[in-house]
């Protein structure tokens, strides 16, 4: 764009946008955290579906007990762990703080608590396996307690990160609502 003062008018070279075109940090964080939580929810869904498949095969006796062991007691309440994830997903479209808080509280009850109970329930079998080398439950020829401890460790990590990101998202949403109230 040419002008009488010279080849280009001041401020029209495209470098004047930086002071105007900025997305507030809490909005950027909100988008990033929602994406991370969604990824963790999908990983949780895969773990949950594998657990449902294992329990279904065990209860419906599709395979012998030598191939797939009967479920441990902690696996039944852990099936409810899908509810906090669904509440979390429902909270995203309109930044619903109450759904996110409910999701975090129910995650402790339906996800973390059964995993803690599961680690205590399987500990004697794991101790016997590693001291004496004897396993009594199997999953496709492998020790069921070893495989289930791996699943348990993975699930604890997924839920811990999910809680961490949910707390950060909640803080981000509170920041944006506080700024709206001050205006």
UniProtKB/Swiss-Prot annotation:
Topology of the protein relative to the lipid bilayer: Multi-pass membrane protein
Keyword ATP-binding: no
Pfam families attached to this UniProt entry: Jagunal
GO BP annotation list: defense response to fungus; endoplasmic reticulum organization; exocytosis; granulocyte colony-stimulating factor signaling pathway; insulin metabolic process; insulin secretion; negative regulation of insulin secretion involved in cellular response to glucose stimulus; neutrophil differentiation
Main location: endoplasmic reticulum
Subunit annotation: Interacts with COPA, COPB2 and COPG2.
This protein's name: Protein jagunal homolog 1
Source organism of the structure: Homo sapiens
